[in-house]
Amino acid sequence: SSMLQKYGLYDLAVIENQYSALLALNLDMIPVNISVPDSARSQITGIMLRLTDTNVVSKELYPYVANTIEQINIVMKALIPEIQLEIYNDFDKLMENGKDGIQFEIITVRDDARIPLLYESAGIKKLISICSNLVACYNQESYCLVVDELDSGIYEYLLGECLEVMQEKAKGQLIFTSHNLRPLEVLENDFLLYTTVNPENRYIKSTYIKNTQNTRLSYLRSIKLGGQKEKLYNETNIYEMELAMRRAGKVGLHG
């Protein structure tokens, strides 16, 4: 069990969709993968960073935080060139446990203009929050990153570019859910699982779809015509939807 605990502490990251919601509301902290040498791992078990407020970390940990921000900037420059992160207003501060610490804030810089991360979009904050974990997943064979609704708030084309890079060269494992169909255009069919309407068999691999086919079109065709082991979607009637819209629009007009 100690091996599993060690793996969970250092090589497994799970980012639920509630983190994205809290980031959008600027209410909470998010887990950030801090790259530390093996010799220091026993003292450092992970960190929660406030992306929209001030942080206080120990003096021993601060250099690793600064290195992580540098890592994120390298990736962000490739994804969104006009945005860089900066550690702002760092100074010595006594921590609650009586040890020496450093207080700092993380801000974004656009065209030499400093902007509090508070005012960035939810999509930008989400990208920043998972960047360090993506770096670890890309470079470490033992690393597993699990992200709920990876597509939430992220530009569709950028999502596809990120997935293409991870599929081709990542050493670790990335597991994610998505409502967006863009991943179907990028990922090989062998890497895809589809949700069904059957609670007893919620996830299936598709049948009769080869990697040479347009997976997105094949998926949409399966929704309309069937052909998979399970039903993928409860069919909706467009005419009933139109009628419902008209009826709803009349509520209260003649009351």
Model region roles, listed by residue range:
Residues I128-N133, E164:
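Contiguous, well-ordered alpha-helical segments that form the cores/surfaces of helical PPI scaffolds
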Residues N133-Y143:
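Short basic/glycine-enriched coil/helix segment immediately N-terminal to the Walker B
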Residues C144-V146, I175:
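Structural motif
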Residues E161-G255:
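C-terminal lobe/lid and adjacent interdomain/linker elements of RecA-like ASCE P-loop ATPase modules
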